[in-house]
Curated annotation (Swiss-Prot):
One of its GO terms (biological process) is translation. Gene3D superfamilies: 3.30.1320.10. This is Small ribosomal subunit protein bS16. Keywords: Ribonucleoprotein, Ribosomal protein. It comes from Psychromonas ingrahamii (strain DSM 17664 / CCUG 51855 / 37). The keyword Ribonucleoprotein applies. Belongs to the bacterial ribosomal protein bS16 family. GO terms for cellular component: cytoplasm; small ribosomal subunit.
């Protein structure tokens, strides 16, 4: 099954997440099919906290991809903010 979820990057105590489309059986930080955005929970000041390519997310959901709980919340918050 294809899922849209977060992969962790950054350094210790300063996480940075990529929003990726991947096979649900692959490891969290393993290979992915497509990168569709990023989430920076520690963004300060003018730094961009969240960027999502909603067209591509809707495309993958239309093909049957499942959103993880956290990504679903981010998509919902992004839609309200826009």
């Amino acid at each position: 099954m294809v899922t849209i979820r977060l992969t962790r990057g950054g350094v210790k105590k300063r996480p940075f997440y990529q929003v990726v489309v991947t096979d649900s059986r692959s490891p969290r930080d393993g290979c992915f099919l497509e990168k569709v955005g990023f989430f920076n929970p520690t963004a300060q000041g003018q730094a961009e906290r969240l960027r999502l390519d909603t067209d591509r997310i809707n495309h993958w959901v239309g093909l049957g991809a499942q959103l993880s709980d956290r990504v679903a919340k981010l998509v919902k918050d992004n839609a309200v903010a826009a």
